[in-house]
Each structure stands twice: as structure tokens, then as C-alpha cells.
């Protein structure tokens, strides 16, 4: 008996199904004939992938391409974990020094394919060593801002200097990096290096006490005092009030607006400068910490930094001895100790502290980023990471001189205290602890 065309088609379909079907790449189906073998193979692949994930010595074998394809079908989560570790190990081998996070990507840049910074055009002087190592023959070229190959970059900040500045009088100062914890700073043997100076200027965050929020009750008490003073002036008949009294009233109205604008949480997490003692305010508003000094209070020592003509001849860095909050001249520190080197004109008003870019010389860049909330033409704020001008202590900075005012107070007594009826502002900075830094050498003007 001959088979009909329909019978042949049915037999062909059954045969294909039993073989797993044409070009299908999925794992073999578990039919009664091969199901046990497929299950054993799948378990073996998962066991091999798990061993690869748990391996700490790098000795476990990787999956083959076919095994990876099978794993992606039978256990998607395990496959994703396997591929993640595989990429981490590849990055660790190729970019171990500059990528401590082992992601291979920084700011959406693949470090293996793209530059982590743009380029800058330069003309190198005949005596300058700028970029000479990487481009010995090119005196005019475009070079990466980093200026060094990836393998020579350092994720732990030990070779980073933010800026080196030669002032008009010829003295040299450097701006230090924001420090890591002093306990895990490297042990440097070359005491003449700028790296040794950076290590010397590390901030110990465990000792640093940042400001707490303002006392809300005391702030409200100051507001009530100002309200009482305004009411005393407003009681004066409009035909009798003098020009001086009108001006005084305007000052207290402005002071009220300032007090109302203060956010009690604004100083939280900041450290601020006591311009009289050249120390930091503690979290209670008292002056006392020598962990960080703002400004060029420690003389920059040319024997540490070297000059345009000679190299460094430094002895090991010497920490300063403080007298009444001011460091002595015996230290070999470079500029300011610790957090950020700052140079500014101190004062009790926002304008005096902030100044302008020219007056305050606040041109320091923190890791290449200049901190400003306004355009270059309009800005007045200092160019430091999270810099602010704040009232820090609970009541001393908040128009404390006008305490004790009552409805019966004499305007003459209030007028006598006018000059002290103000908010005292302080330059403050929010400390930053940098656990990982992806780029090695972020510099300012390092060459003569």
C-alpha cells in the first residue's frame, strides 16, 4: 500500500519534532529519549558558572561560547552575574591602576576606547618639560589634559596637584587635593616630591566635626527682637521722625528680611572659618580646630616646591606649631594645610568675604571644576566645591547685640548698638571624602 502525500507530510513533521526542529538554537527539548542527558548538561553548566563566580584565585575555567548561550536560556540571572564578573576581570587586568571601581566606564566613557578628557592646544617653551615625555619632538601640539598615559595615572590621589601658582612677587604656592583618610595614605620615601606634600596635607575626616543646624528657638527670638525695634520706630509720628531714624528703620527692616531668609539647616555639614583666630568653627559654633587652615597662613617654602630655575631641596615636611591659632613660619607646608588652599580677604559681610574673582584671588579649581552658581560675568561666589557664606553659630552670628529689647526700650540705646545689629557671615566649605578618583593627574600651571 502506497503512502499518500498527506501521510508523508505527517511523518516528516514527526521526524523533525523528534530531532529538536531544524535550526532552533534553544536547549534540546526534554523528551523521554534525551531529557535526562540535557538536564545533566544544564546542571553541569550552571555548576561551572557558579564556580567561576566564587573563584578568588582566578583559576576557575570560563564557559565556552556554546555554554554561555545555553546558560542564557536556562538561567538568565546566573548568566547576567557571570557576564558581570567576566567584564570586571577583563577591566581589572587592562586598567587596574586607573579604574578602582572595575566598571570600565566613567561618566559614560569606555576607558578602553575613548579619551577621559578632551585636548588642549599648547606651545612648549624650549626649557619646558610639559608633555615632553609623551611628545618629545612636538613643541606645538594638542595634548590630553591629563598629559600622562593611563598606566601612570593614580586613583589614590598620591600624584595629584590641583594648581601651582607663581605670585607676582615670585613666591610659589600650590593648592592641595581634598584628602583621603590619613590612616590609609601611602608611605612616601621621596620627601622632595609634591606627592609627599599632598600626603602631609591630608585631612583626617574622623577628627573633623562639621556644623550642626542653627538653634531654631534662638533664631526666632532674634526675629522677635527685630520686630520690637521696628515697632518702636513706627510709633514715632511721621512729622517728627528724623532722617537718621528713617535710615535706621530701613536697616532693621533689611535685617528682618535677612533673618527670615536664613535656613536653620544651611550650615549643616559645613566647616567655616573664624577669621579672627584663623581656625575652623566646631559643630557647636566655637572656634578651635586646627585640622584645616584656610588661606595662606603657613608660608610657602620654596625649598619644598622648587622655583622656576631650581628643583626641590626639601627636608621631610614639618607640621606647623600654632600660637593663638596662627601657625609659625618653621613649617615646610605649602600654603594652606588640608582641605583646600584658599586665598581671600576676610570680613564680616557677605561682600567682603566673597569679593570678586580678582580681589579674592579665588581662582582655585577643585578637580578641574570651578564651583559657581552664576555666569562668569555676574558671579561673586568663591570658586571652591560647595563653598558658601553662612551664619554658623547658634546665636552669636544672629544679630546678638540687640538682645533684651522691650516695648519700653529707649531708641537712643538701640541706636548705640546699630553697628553690631547685623548677621556675621563666614566663609564655609563642605568637606568631600573621595574614595575613588578615576583620573590621575588633574593640574593647573605646573610648568615654569
Curated annotation (Swiss-Prot):
Q: What keywords would UniProt list here? A: Hydrolase, Protease, Serine protease, Signal
Q: Give the signal peptide range.
A: 1-20
Q: Which GO terms describe its biological process?
A: proteolysis
EC number(s) reported in the record: 3.4.21.-
Q: What are its cofactors?
A: a divalent metal cation
- List the Gene Ontology MF annotations in alphabetical order: serine-type peptidase activity
Give the region (Disordered) as residue ranges.
87-109
What is the superkingdom listed in this entry's lineage? Bacteria
Similarity section: Belongs to the peptidase S17 family.
Function, in words: This enzyme is a chymotrypsin-like serine protease. Degrades a variety of substrates present in the skin and hoof of the sheep, including elastin, keratin, fibrinogen and collagen. It seems to play an important role in the pathogenesis of sheep footrot.
Q: What is this protein called?
A: Extracellular serine protease
Q: Which organism is it from?
A: Dichelobacter nodosus
Amino acid at each position: 500500500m502506497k503512502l499518500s502525500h498527506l501521510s508523508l507530510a505527517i511523518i516528516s513533521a514527526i521526524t523533525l519534532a523528534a530531532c529538536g526542529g531544524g535550526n532552533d538554537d534553544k536547549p534540546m527539548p526534554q523528551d523521554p529519549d534525551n531529557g535526562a542527558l540535557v538536564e545533566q548538561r544544564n546542571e553541569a553548566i550552571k555548576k561551572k558558572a557558579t564556580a567561576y563566580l566564587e573563584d578568588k584565585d582566578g583559576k576557575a575555567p570560563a564557559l565556552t561560547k556554546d555554554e554561555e548561550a545555553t546558560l542564557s536560556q536556562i538561567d538568565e540571572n546566573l548568566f547576567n552575574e557571570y557576564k558581570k564578573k567576566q567584564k570586571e576581570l577583563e577591566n581589572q587586568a587592562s586598567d587596574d591602576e586607573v579604574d578602582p571601581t572595575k566598571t570600565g566606564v566613567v561618566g559614560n566613557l569606555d576607558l578602553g576606547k575613548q579619551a577621559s578628557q578632551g585636548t588642549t592646544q599648547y606651545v612648549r617653551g624650549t626649557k619646558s618639560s610639559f608633555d615632553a615625555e609623551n611628545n618629545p619632538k612636538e613643541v606645538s601640539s594638542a595634548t590630553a589634559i591629563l598629559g600622562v598615559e593611563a598606566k601612570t595615572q593614580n586613583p589614590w590621589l598620591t600624584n595629584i596637584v590641583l594648581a601651582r601658582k607663581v605670585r607676582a612677587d615670585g613666591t610659589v604656592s600650590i593648592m592641595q587635593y581634598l584628602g583621603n583618610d590619613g590612616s590609609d595614605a601611602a608611605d612616601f620615601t621621596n620627601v622632595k616630591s609634591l606627592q609627599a606634600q599632598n600626603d602631609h596635607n591630608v585631612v583626617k575626616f574622623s577628627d573633623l566635626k562639621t556644623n550642626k543646624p542653627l538653634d531654631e528657638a534662638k533664631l526666632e527670638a532674634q526675629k522677635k527682637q527685630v520686630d520690637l525695634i521696628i515697632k518702636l520706630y513706627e510709633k514715632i509720628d511721621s512729622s517728627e521722625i528724623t532722617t537718621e531714624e528713617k535710615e535706621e528703620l530701613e536697616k532693621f527692616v533689611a535685617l528682618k528680611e535677612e533673618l527670615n531668609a536664613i535656613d536653620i539647616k544651611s550650615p549643616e555639614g559645613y566647616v567655616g572659618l573664624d577669621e579672627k583666630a584663623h581656625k575652623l568653627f566646631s559643630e557647636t559654633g566655637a572656634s578651635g580646630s586646627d585640622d584645616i587652615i584656610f588661606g595662606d597662613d603657613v608660608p610657602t617654602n620654596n625649598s619644598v616646591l622648587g622655583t622656576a630655575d631650581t628643583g626641590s631641596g626639601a627636608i621631610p615636611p614639618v607640621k606647623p606649631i600654632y600660637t593663638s591659632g596662627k601657625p609659625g613660619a618653621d613649617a615646610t607646608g605649602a600654603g594652606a594645610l588640608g582641605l583646600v588652599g584658599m586665598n581671600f580677604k576676610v570680613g564680616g559681610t557677605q561682600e567682603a568675604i566673597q569679593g570678586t574673582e580678582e580681589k579674592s584671588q579665588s581662582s582655585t579649581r577643585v578637580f578641574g571644576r570651578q564651583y559657581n552658581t552664576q555666569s562668569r560675568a555676574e558671579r561673586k561666589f568663591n570658586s571652591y566645591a560647595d563653598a558658601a557664606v553662612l551664619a554658623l553659630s547658634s546665636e552669636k552670628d544672629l544679630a546678638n547685640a540687640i538682645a533684651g529689647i522691650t516695648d519700653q526700650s529707649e531708641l537712643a540705646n538701640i541706636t548705640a548698638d546699630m553697628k553690631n545689629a547685623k548677621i556675621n557671615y563666614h566663609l564655609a566649605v563642605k568637606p568631600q571624602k573621595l574614595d575613588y578618583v578615576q583620573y590621575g593627574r588633574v593640574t593647573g600651571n605646573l610648568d615654569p
